[in-house]
Amino acid sequence: MTTAAKVILACCLLGAFHIQISSSSAIPIWEFLTRNEKMSHLYSTFAQLVSVHCKSTAAVGGLPVNQCKHNLLGYGSAKLQTLSDVQLEALDPYQRDANELIWSSIMGDHPSGASLVTTRQPLQQPLPTPPASSLIILTRQQLPHGASHAHPIQSSGSATNPIFESGEQKHKYAMDMDKAYGYGPQSSSELPMAAALTSEPSKRFLTGPLVIRVRPDGSPVEEDKMMPLPRDEDLPYFHLGLAAAQPNRHRKIATISSLKQQHFASILQSDLQPPHQTQRRLFRQQQA
């Protein structure tokens, strides 16, 4: 056997060994995670599935979204506590069809027997027709005929299954599970340009208790000078705190000069007083 053949055989054996090691799990690190870490990953994945399931079932007359989430998340958390280490090992969230496997393992014994629903049901009422404006009509007529059929797979996939939105990856960073699968603002039948022209401006302004108006040149408005200042709601509590702390206030610390004067005064007073023995003799004479 030549040297080249030996090298090729060694490379093949080494490649087969690596394939055999990596085929045990989609991500090998899952096997080295602790039980608490595995349960944390599985609960996060289950919470995302619950959010989509409750959003989809609420549109067809199911439970309200908040109540549905509360019930399913509580049941799923209790169910994860009962799973053994072998079952947690098999629920790798990065393997193929992991969502269905995790959902069936957790919700298999649920009283409702709810199956995973990841598609929105069609609306009971048709969408409102756009306003008959020339701008919308012209814009719709200018669209090429092949534009609507250019990507039929992508349009149908995003409309029927919002769980696999490739354009939005907010679920990696957002805390709200509802943002993970494209449940954003409500869709409109108008085009973006027409919606911007026909929509009403926002009437919500950010104002506080004190508003200072100025003219374009920066000078204040004369009418605002007569307006009363806003009332400070914390001022009464501040006064009450000062009144309560008044008796317990500490006295001021004496300065060095005052301490010296006090010491010298005590020395001078002791020098002016008569000696103790003479004072005791006078006291005995008075008593006799």
From Swiss-Prot:
Q: In which tissues is it expressed?
A: Expressed in head, but not in the body. Expression levels oscillate with the circadian rhythm.
| Keywords from the UniProt entry | Biological rhythms
Tell me, what is an example of a GO biological process annotation in this record?
rhythmic process
> What is the stated purpose of this protein?
Involved in the generation of biological rhythms (Potential). In the head, oscillates in abundance with a daily peak during early night, even under constant darkness. Oscillation is dependent on period (per) function.
- Designated name of the protein: Rhythmically expressed gene 5 protein
Its source organism is Drosophila melanogaster (Fruit fly)
**The organism's taxonomic lineage, starting at the top:** Eukaryota, Metazoa, Ecdysozoa, Arthropoda, Hexapoda
Question: By which gene is this protein encoded?
Answer: Reg-5
